[in-house]
Amino acid sequence: SGFPNRAAFDQALGDAVAAVQPDWIVCAGYMRILGASFVQRFAGRLLNIHPSLLPKYRGLHTHAQALAAGDAEHGASVHFVVPELDAGAVIAQARVPVQAGDRAEDLAQRLLPREHALLCAVLQLAAAGRLAERDGSVWLDGQCRFSPLRLDCQGMLIP
């Protein structure tokens, strides 16, 4: 990797990100766990999309886990990133049905377009200045959200 240790990598990544002065940092398909120092440096500006209805199925192989559990539905979540894996406040979720005979690959393929729509909808809120994280909670339009927004069939977020 060209770095003597994880701390050096996190510092270099943080410096590269800080150099472009982003309003938001989005982890989409980034399959590495971010170090605590990086997460703390950009706290409240780091978003991740995760293929499960958090807090269910943190980490990898979420589609297979949903099938093994016999879940009737599966989904995706956009959440604020905190040092603990997939544990940040959930902003919004999208759901899909689990169908008889589904394999993990089928479920992943059915969910992917909903994940894309979900991430785009949340990023619209963020870019418009409507979204914030305070004290581990999601705030939308100056109001604390006690449950995640839901993506409807038209790709709109609803309470």
Predicted features, each with a name:
Residues 1-159:
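One-carbon transfer enzymes
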